[in-house]
Amino acid sequence: MPNNRREAARITLMTHHGLSDRVVELLSSLNLPAVLAENARCVRQNVKAGYWGFSSLRMGFSDAASEIYRLTVKRESAVPLLCRLIEGLELRTPGRGAIYAQNVEEISQRDLPDIELEQVKSDWLLSDLALITGIQTKSGGGENLYKVALKLGAGVPVVGIGIGTGIRDRLGLLRITISPEKELVHLMVPGHDANGLQRLLIEEGHVDRPGGGFLYQTPIQAGMVDPLLRIGRQEHAASIEQIIAAIDDLKKSTAWRKRFFGVEDISDNASVANFTHREISFFCYEGQSDNLVEAAMQAGAAGATVSRLRTLYLQGADAGKSISC
């Protein structure tokens, strides 16, 4: 069966682990054949009362087990599917997760699923978004990117785990000094602030230093962010995150909370400069990634990061079966 190259939309859903059964049930009801799932963690700031009863608050970090689900559909089905998943999983409630769609080119032997969904009102979907992805060694000298992102109020980071290959494999004995484990930080941010936040993340996270990792941004077609940056003690009737989410809903945009002006504005020239590369993702069965990585290195790629996912089959005789990939 030949490989087909076509335009598609990749849907990425990041939810709390407790919603896993509900996600699978909802996707099955939409007649989707399968979905890729990845274990991850969602990091938020944890606000606690000060020591000895003082009024000052202490700030820490709290991890919550999360799942990242990925599937590709026809581009015309992306927005209706986003709306259906947001409604079915109640993602407009802060803390339940985030979702977004990106336009991609896909090469696969499998046909894109036919989804029959009614066209729904999508005014509350945000379209002025960008995805910042950072890949950093777990034992790196710089501060963790997710901590920097939370301190900057950039958004709620979702962190996955991967194994670095490519450059490290060429270092010989020196590679024992570099941990192969990588943290993959996924961060949805307003598109108009993406340049400024990317610059701050690079500086504060020491990404521009040798061994500091790398960071890049990709455009988002539409999505819904999770505004719950902080959990724990709350001193007012509504948190600042709830207020921001309400204003986003009223304004139908995040442009009102622009943080960087002047040199950080995204002009036509800046937009072209930001997207000079392409992200290439291979999804294969476990044990086949080495050949793909080797081919990528021979074609000129500087490195690759391998993550472990699983394919969840949702229909037919294989429904409920999970295969590592």
Locate each region found by the language model:
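Positively charged, small/polar-rich N-terminal and surface patches that mediate targeting and assembly
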Residues: 1-325
